[in-house]
C-alpha cells in the first residue's frame, strides 16, 4: 500500500527538497500545504499516514496545527521540523504528541530514517 504523506512548510523549496527525497525512495503519494491552516483542512479531508510539518509558519503555526490534528485524530503520526533547534519547542511538540523532531538543516538520510521508522 502506498503510504500518504502530508508535507507542511511555508517554504516551497523545503517542500520540494523533502518531496524529492521521498519520491526517489519510493514514497510517491505526497500532498503539500503551505501553512498550518491548510495542513489541518488537508489532514481532515485526507487522513494521511504521516504529517511532516514545520513549526514557524504564517496563519497557523505548526504547534497550533499539531494540537488541532491530534484533537481531531489522536492516532495521527506527526513529525515536526524547524530551523529553531530550541529545546522548549522540541519538548512542547513531543508533549503534544509529535513522534519526532527534525532540526533544519537536515540530511536526506535523516528524513528517510524517520519516515521509515514510522511507516514501515
Region spans (language model):
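Two-component/phosphorelay signaling modules centered on CheY-like receiver
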Residues: 12-31
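Acidic catalytic/metal-coordinating carboxylates
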Residues: 35-38, 61-64
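Active-site beta3 strand of CheY-like receiver
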Residues: 46-52
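Receiver (REC) domain active-site loop signature in two-component systems and cognate sites
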Residues: 57
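Short, conserved "switch-loop" micro-motifs in signal-transduction and mechanochemical regulators
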Residues: 84-85
Amino acid at each position: 500500500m502506498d503510504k500518504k504523506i502530508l508535507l507542511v512548510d511555508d517554504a516551497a523549496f523545503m517542500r520540494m527538497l523533502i518531496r524529492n527525497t521521498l519520491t526517489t525512495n519510493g514514497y510517491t503519494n505526497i500532498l503539500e500545504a503551505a501553512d498550518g491552516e491548510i495542513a489541518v483542512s488537508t489532514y481532515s479531508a485526507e487522513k494521511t499516514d504521516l504529517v511532516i510539518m514545520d513549526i514557524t509558519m504564517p496563519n497557523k503555526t505548526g504547534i497550533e496545527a499539531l494540537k488541532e490534528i491530534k484533537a481531531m485524530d489522536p492516532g495521527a503520526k506527526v513529525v515536526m521540523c524547524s530551523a529553531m533547534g530550541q529545546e522548549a519547542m522540541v519538548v512542547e511538540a513531543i508533549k503534544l504528541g509529535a513522534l519526532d523532531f527534525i532540526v533544519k538543516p537536515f540530511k536526506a538520510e535523516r528524513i528517510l530514517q524517520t519516515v521509515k521508522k514510522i511507516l514501515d
